[in-house]
Amino acid sequence: MKDTIIQWHPGFVAAMHLELAENLEELIFEKEYNLNTKPLLVDLLVIKKESSVPIKNEIGAIFREYNIMEYKSPKDKLDIDVIYKTIAYACLYKSYGEAVNKREAKEITLSLVREGKPEGLFRYCKQEGILVEKKYNGIYYIFNHWLFPVQIIVTKELEEENHIWLKALTEKIKEQEMQRLLKQIQ
């Protein structure tokens, strides 16, 4: 009897049906609801080996110990739901540490990268009183609103000499820009 594993979730689901019995007609119950059809993957996780070492590239100025980066292709949207999805990834990453609070929330940042400026997202932030601060050309910070510091990187606005590689992630690359990239490789 000691090795018996109690399945609590079916009992919980049944109990919630009974608790909310007066409104069963108005409710939908989805037990063990799949949040996603594919495995949840972070586009890029950048871990600072030594937290006191400053990152020279301005994209890394916001970095703490754990830095989650989400890339959106030129055709992908970057809206408020993408922000919340990325926050959810960060929350899961934080909670899956090897021990309780092994990954402290204060040591996590989020970076969302896209070619075009997410005008709709910035409008939403303004309407909701969320401060978006332009920190550098093409780099916008959002502090003190969500659980983690967020930066939005607009690759089209970045200075080419410092960010040639990110700026190359476009469908509109020009021949002279391609030649500059090839020279950088050689």
Task: Explain the meaning of each model-derived region.
Residues 1-186:
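Elongated, amphipathic alpha-helical interaction scaffolds
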